[in-house]
Amino acid sequence: MTMSDPIADMLTRIRNALMAGHTSVRAPSSKIKVAIAKILKEEGFVEDYYVTRERPQPQLVVRLKYVGERKERHPVITGLKRVSKPGCRVYTRVSQIPWVRSGVGIAILTTPKGVLTGQQARRLGVGGEVLCQVW
């Protein structure tokens, strides 16, 4: 059976792993998922990511980031929200790119210039499809 929304599946796997206190999470790999993981690493939300060369489907492994000591540690990511869904796509102009939690979080967009954060898209003057929000 095929998956109807692979990006939402990846975000849900990350959310569930954070709630369970896991150090890493695995998901089937794709170019857009790797681009999202790259942005999460650049913005400091995850420690690292890499792609395994398993057959038949390569796996994206994301190492999650926590703050604090062992018993008092809290995840850096406090929330993930899928915005544009297969049944209801959400596109935005550069002037209407959303601010997430008053600038604390990020919006991730897919644009003609690639997968970008909301801030990068504003700087480049491009709009696009709002994939998700992370805070």
Task: Give the residues covered by each predicted segment.
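Core subunits and conserved enzymes of cellular information-processing
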Residues: M1-W135
